[in-house]
Amino acid sequence: MTRIPFELKGKTVFVAGHRGMVGSALVRRLAAEDVELLTLARSEVDLRDQAAVNRWFAANRPQAVFLAAAKVGGIVANNTLRAEFLYDNLAIATNLIHAAHVNTCEKLMFFGSSCIYPKLAPQPLREDSMLTGALEPTNEPYAIAKIVGIKMVETYRSQYGCDFISVMPTNLYGRGDNYHPEYSHVVAALIRRFHEAKALGARNVVVWEIGRAHV
């Protein structure tokens, strides 16, 4: 079957999470396209509030949605804010995906994460490895929320015929990343640690692996 690419030209496009690394990159890219670009600040609408999200969708009628909004962080953040990572990310994903369906969005792309795969999944990772084993404990709440989002996309596509898809970026870094010493992702954290070590002339660098510090 030949797949027909979705044409964004002339569409109203909503980037959820436009201030994050992925979302801001999408905004920069879409700025060069013939689209009506919609973004939404946290102060305007709490994406964890289903009623507020539904009202915004009904008023703005986005035709395409890039769902890059999420509460994210590194090992320390995932370990210490487990309830927040689960609740916030579940609410964001379920609210936006359902609102997109209710308001007949033509296309939605949900950004997953490589942490959805089992800790001991065979390498290289395969898509069908999801839900075949235990998750990495340090980011299990975040991973569970992402899995729910992926499954919502699958089920809304199969039951309602929604043109919703998921993509799985892995170890992203770049412009707009978070380089906080405790709450950043692995690549950004390593860049900061090695940069600071070189600047200070340090002989050793402390790095984290499954929640334990190594020198």
Predicted regions and their residues:
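N-terminal Rossmann NAD(P)H-binding glycine-rich loop of SDR-like oxidoreductase domains
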Residues: I4-L30
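SDR active-site strand-loop-helix element
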Residues: A16, L40, V65-K71, L108-S114, ...
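Adenosine-cofactor binding site in Rossmann-like domains, unifying the SAM/SAH pocket
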Residues: A31-W56
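Conserved cofactor-binding/catalytic machinery of classical short-chain dehydrogenase/reductase
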Residues: D49, A64, D88-I92, K107, ...
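NAD(P)H-binding glycine-rich loop region in Rossmannoid oxidoreductase-like domains
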Residues: Q50-L90, A99-V102, K119
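Conserved Rossmann-fold NAD(P)-dependent oxidoreductase catalytic core, especially the SDR/UDP-sugar
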Residues: T94-N139, I165
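NAD(P)-dependent short-chain dehydrogenase/reductase
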Residues: L120-S129, K151-H214
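Active-site helix of classical SDR
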Residues: P141, A145-V148
